[in-house]
Amino acid sequence: MAVPKRKTSPSRRGMRRSHDALSAEAFHECSNCGELKRPHMLCNACGHYNGREVIAVGL
């Protein structure tokens, strides 16, 4: 079984964990309806992407 030879210092532990933080998800306002949507994604509320209707949403 692998066992550490030396105790890991707090500095080294922190450097290892420096990439583990979670970032907040990005949201942008839809240019057509104003709903919040993920960037580079189709708007779920109105079906528009990049200024044009991609899918018909609603009735």
From Swiss-Prot:
Basic residues composition bias: residue spans: 1-16
Keywords associated with the record: Ribonucleoprotein, Ribosomal protein
Signal sequence extent: none
Gene Ontology cellular component list: large ribosomal subunit
Residue ranges of the region described as Disordered: 1-20
Pfam short name (any one): Ribosomal_L32p
Entry's Gene Ontology BP terms: translation
One Gene Ontology molecular-function label: structural constituent of ribosome
Domain of life where this protein originates: Bacteria
PANTHER family with a match to the protein in the record: 50S RIBOSOMAL PROTEIN L32, LARGE RIBOSOMAL SUBUNIT PROTEIN BL32
Protein family membership: Belongs to the bacterial ribosomal protein bL32 family.
Protein name (Swiss-Prot/TrEMBL): Large ribosomal subunit protein bL32
Species whose genome carries this gene: Novosphingobium aromaticivorans (strain ATCC 700278 / DSM 12444 / CCUG 56034 / CIP 105152 / NBRC 16084 / F199)
Gene that encodes it: rpmF
